[in-house]
Each structure stands twice: as structure tokens, then as C-alpha cells.
């Protein structure tokens, strides 16, 4: 009986780990072979776990505005690199390089953010540092 309990516990642990790894896989959500670059104005910032999100108003070719969601690394990871929530200010004009969502939505994982004054920061998590 004790042996069966250990095996059950081991299998349950392995299954739980698979879900966690799938959630944190950039490859699952974003096409890392298709880089994208957008420019716009930061509309809002959500600085919370497990990943920060910031949203840009992006001017389309037809003159209209569309909202793009940009996923970044975890707040703790970013703060260890000196990037605080004060860096991404609402109203700032930025260009963002990253990878578009696989589902074709106007979401992306942001890697490099370049500000109008030429400063840039790397907002992606460590899994995207390639």
C-alpha cells in the first residue's frame, strides 16, 4: 500500500508540473519566429504577477486607433533589473519589439521598449532572452 501511495504522489506531482511549464512557455502563446514591432502611446499598465501587461494605443494605416496588449516579465524579475513600474508611464510614446500572439490577436510579448528620448529597456522574462 505504501508503494502505491508513493507512485500516486509522484504521478500527481509530474502532472502538476506539466501545467505550470505550459503556462510559462512563451512558445505556446507567441510565435518566436515572427518578430513584430509596434509604436504607440502607453494607455495603461498592470504591474502584477505573474506577468506585467501594458497597453498601447497604436495608430493604424487607416488613421484609426487600436489597442495592443503587451506582456512582460514578472514584476520581481523586472525590478531586479532596475525596471520599476515608474519606467512605463501612461502617456509615454514608445516603440516595442517582440513577438505576436499565435492566435492573431493584437497581443504580443514585449522584449525591447524604446522611448522617444532613445532610452530602451528589456521587459521580457528570462525565457525570452535568446
PLM regions with names:
Residues 48-58:
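Short aromatic-glycine-enriched beta-strand elements
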Residues 72-80:
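Short, structured beta-strand/loop micro-motifs enriched in basic residues and often containing a Trp
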Residues 1-9:
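Bacterial N-terminal signal peptides that target proteins for export
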Residues 22-36:
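Short boundary/loop segments of OB/S1/cold-shock single-stranded nucleic-acid-binding domains
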Residues 34-50:
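Structural detector for short beta-strands of small beta-barrel domains
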Residues 101-125:
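OB-fold/S1-family single-stranded nucleic acid-binding modules
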Residues 80-96:
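Short nucleic-acid-contacting surface segments enriched for D/E, G, S/T with interspersed K/R
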